[in-house]
Design a protein with these regions (language model features):
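PRPP-associated nucleotide enzymes
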Residues: 1-186
């Protein structure tokens, strides 16, 4: 059982002569003798294909969706802080029957967001940002701040995996986030 598969962001080659870390770890686990893996909210679905054993891929939406419903927020929209999370956020918006808002970001380098634009309307809305991993919190806090500047009533964030590397705590405290909710996968 590996709730947080920490190598999941290394799911493809992004530079020459770099290994695909998620595939390497999948091979190591198989050689070590595991015959089944249970994990949660993989960063990329294709990681399941790196294994030669059955992978049970669980989703935190089973916990998060009832929580969001319990908030009874009016004018709710679901948002994703990056286009890569659009499939995940779309599942939430369809289930809840509310609009979906996307953020389009560009990065200068790893863990550094250069620019971000909102695609959709957040003015006078209660926004719930849905993500899989919060590491340095740069993306999620930038998205929250941009949405507050665009007139959102409130911005909450939910994420499956809470890494919170420095300077994440500072960024969250200084951001426009009303609330952050995580699982205890780490």
């Amino acid at each position: 059982v590996i709730p947080y598969f920490g190598w999941a962001r290394q799911d493809r080659k992004d530079k020459p002569r770099v290994s695909i870390g998620a595939k390497l770890v999948a091979d190591l686990l198989s050689v070590a003798g595991i015959d089944r893996l249970i994990t949660m909210d993989l960063h990329a679905d294709q990681i399941q294909g790196f294994f030669n054993i059955p992978v049970d891929h669980l989703y935190a939406s089973a916990v998060f969706l009832p929580y969001i419903e319990s908030l009874k927020l009016d004018d709710l929209v679901i948002a994703t802080p990056d286009v890569g999370g659009s499939k995940r956020a779309s599942t939430f918006s369809k289930y809840l029957g509310v609009p979906l808002v996307l953020c389009n970001k560009t990065r200068e380098k790893a863990n550094v967001v250069a620019t971000m634009q909102i695609i959709g309307d957040v003015k006078d809305k209660n926004v719930v940002l849905v993500d899989d991993i919060v590491d340095t919190a740069g993306t999620i806090t930038k998205a929250a701040n941009i949405m507050m500047e665009a007139g959102a009533k409130s911005v909450r964030a939910i994420a499956s995996h809470c890494v919170m590397s420095d300077p994440a705590s500072f960024r969250v405290q200084e951001s426009g986030l009303t609330e952050m909710v995580f699982t205890d996968s780490i």
